[in-house]
Amino acid sequence: MKLKPLQIGNLVARIPIIQGGMGIGISLSGLAGAVAKEGGVGVISAAQPGFNEPDFRENTQEANMRALGREIRKAKEISNNGVIGVNIMCALRHYKEYVRCCIENGADLIISGAGLPTLLPELVQGSKIKFAPIVSSLKAIQVLFKLWTRRYHTVSDFVVIEGPMAGVIWASLQKKFKAMIFRIMMRKSSV
């Protein structure tokens, strides 16, 4: 079976798979770089990427920022400049700094959940980075798109929809989300 490439703005993943961001040492440069090298979208998790840094206990935030930047650059290198994203939870205390770190270190996209990323368009403004919220309902994306359109005159580049079996697309979920996806696409094209 031939799959169509995934296009997000000017980014193209030959294989339409976005690897999920799994925290604390799972989704780092090795996994994300390998996925992107094979043609998918590799995703690094911003949840404690610096846990192996020698000063992690004393300087947690600095260790995490340093490690995240290094993991992004390393994943880009492993993947031969494939599509690399970062999953940043809205609930993280230093959310804005994580977004800035992604932009400064060459991540291609940010995927953000664990809350509604209401400030994300403002934080990425002026950069080339693509962004997406993680939502579980049409209502959530309608609220975000309405807010973003009013405040920033924009909406996200794509949307990640997570159902009760997050990260897994089953036939039953495809039916349920088909209408939702269509409505999201219509909204995106009208902005």
PLM regions and their residue ranges:
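Active-site entrance/lid segments in N-terminal catalytic domains of soluble metabolic enzymes
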Residues: M1-V191
